[in-house]
Each structure stands twice: as structure tokens, then as C-alpha cells.
Regions:
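Bimodal "functional hotspot" detector
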Residues: 1-132
């Protein structure tokens, strides 16, 4: 029987659109790979009603780069408040678990993040790691 451990990350409470901490029990050999983390975060957001379209989550230099698919949540179909809550939950989850990374960058299909509500440069750091 393999050892288990608990990891913490964030999701969105659909009732008040606040980010809230949740946890999942994973095998102790669960690595802090951004793609593995993204699966947990996506599943949790999907439970809250936000089906996130992720192309990839990878380390790029000192940042974690989350590349979203176009035409899906959080890029389209959300209010500004919902979109911000989803982005905050993803960014905070990444930084809390990948403590060596400096920040989180969001892109759409490898390009700058531009949605109905937000527009960020291709290398804009959305959230910086306050643990560093």
C-alpha cells in the first residue's frame, strides 16, 4: 500500500465567487509537476461549474506558464468577477505548491492573454510568489 499525502490548492466558491482552499489526498510520490497540479485544480473548478480549457502548464525560467485553450473557460463565457476568481485560484494554487517559482503567467494558445474582460502581455506576471 503506497503512502498518501494531502496537498492544498484553491478553487472558486460559485455562491460568492471567492477563492477557497481545498485539499486532495494523493500518493506520496505525487510530484509538484504543474500539469499534475493543473489536473487537480481543473477537476475542482469543474465541480464548481467552471470547465477550464487548459493546453499546458509548464515551468518557463522562474515562472509557471499556464496556456489556456481559446473559446473556453476562463477565456470566454465568464463575467469579469468569475474570470478573476478562476485565474486567482489557479495562480495561488501554483505558487503555494511550486514554491521555487517566482510567478504565474497566463497565455491563450501560446499568445498574450486577451479575453472579453482582461488583456495581459504575453510575459505579464499575473501573480508573484509572496513566499520568496
Amino acid at each position: 500500500l503506497s503512502e498518501m499525502k494531502e496537498i492544498y490548492f484553491y478553487t472558486v466558491n460559485p455562491d460568492n465567487l471567492e477563492t477557497e482552499a481545498v485539499s486532495a489526498v494523493v500518493k506520496s510520490d505525487f510530484t509538484d509537476d504543474p500539469n499534475d497540479l493543473m489536473v487537480l485544480i481543473s477537476d475542482s473548478l469543474e465541480d464548481a461549474g467552471y470547465e477550464v480549457g487548459i493546453k499546458s502548464a509548464e515551468l518557463e525560467g522562474e515562472n509557471v506558464v499556464i496556456d489556456f485553450s481559446s473559446g473556453m473557460c476562463p477565456v470566454s463565457g465568464l463575467t469579469e468577477k468569475e474570470e478573476k476568481a478562476v485565474l486567482d485560484a489557479i495562480a495561488q494554487s501554483m505558487l503555494d505548491n511550486l514554491t521555487e517559482q517566482n510567478g504565474v503567467v497566463f497565455r491563450i494558445m501560446g499568445e498574450a492573454y486577451e479575453s472579453e474582460n482582461f488583456s495581459f502581455g504575453r510575459d505579464y506576471v499575473y501573480m508573484k510568489n509572496h513566499h520568496k
